[in-house]
């Protein structure tokens, strides 16, 4: 860097770029170099990507099974109570 700064005063840091035309000249001095081998890194702006929404059930399958079992158990209890009530009415 020191040798390059001695040959080119714009690299020494002593001379500052004062206006846009000088800036354009400095930018034109540098050329773009793409590697022929190895990874190439590209800066990219992160953007939101919309994807298809995944619909989840409000109740899990196991919860639905438990509710069905509970409902069936309540129905059988009601039927048994009705049968006992009918037997009591018949015997009285």
Swiss-Prot record:
It is found in: Cell projection, Cilium; Cytoplasm. Its main location: other. The keyword Transport applies. Pfam families: BBIP10. Residues 1-22 are annotated as: Disordered. One of its GO terms (biological process) is Wnt signaling pathway. GO terms for cellular component: BBSome; ciliary membrane; cytoplasm; cytosol. Residues 13-22 have a biased composition (Polar residues). Keywords: Bardet-Biedl syndrome, Cell projection, Ciliopathy, Cilium, Cilium biogenesis/degradation, Cytoplasm, Obesity, Protein transport, Transport. Coiled coil: none annotated. Transmembrane segments: none annotated. The BBSome complex is thought to function as a coat complex required for sorting of specific membrane proteins to the primary cilia. The BBSome complex is required for ciliogenesis but is dispensable for centriolar satellite function. This ciliogenic function is mediated in part by the Rab8 GDP/GTP exchange factor, which localizes to the basal body and contacts the BBSome. Rab8(GTP) enters the primary cilium and promotes extension of the ciliary membrane. Belongs to the BBIP10 family. Part of BBSome complex, that contains BBS1, BBS2, BBS4, BBS5, BBS7, BBS8, BBS9 and BBIP10. Interacts with HDAC6. It is linked to Bardet-Biedl syndrome 18: A syndrome characterized by usually severe pigmentary retinopathy, early-onset obesity, polydactyly, hypogenitalism, renal malformation and intellectual disability. Secondary features include diabetes mellitus, hypertension and congenital heart disease. Bardet-Biedl syndrome inheritance is autosomal recessive, but three mutated alleles (two at one locus, and a third at a second locus) may be required for clinical manifestation of some forms of the disease. This is BBSome-interacting protein 1. It comes from Homo sapiens (Human). The gene is BBIP1.
């Amino acid at each position: 860097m020191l040798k390059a700064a001695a040959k080119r005063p714009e690299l020494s840091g002593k001379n500052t770029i004062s206006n846009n035309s000088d800036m354009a000249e400095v930018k034109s001095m540098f050329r773009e170099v793409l590697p022929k081998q190895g990874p190439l890194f590209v800066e990219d702006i992160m953007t939101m990507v919309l994807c298809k929404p995944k619909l989840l059930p409000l109740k899990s399958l196991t919860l639905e099974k438990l509710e069905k079992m509970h409902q069936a158990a309540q129905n059988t209890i009601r039927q048994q109570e009705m049968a006992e009530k009918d037997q009591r009415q018949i015997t009285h």
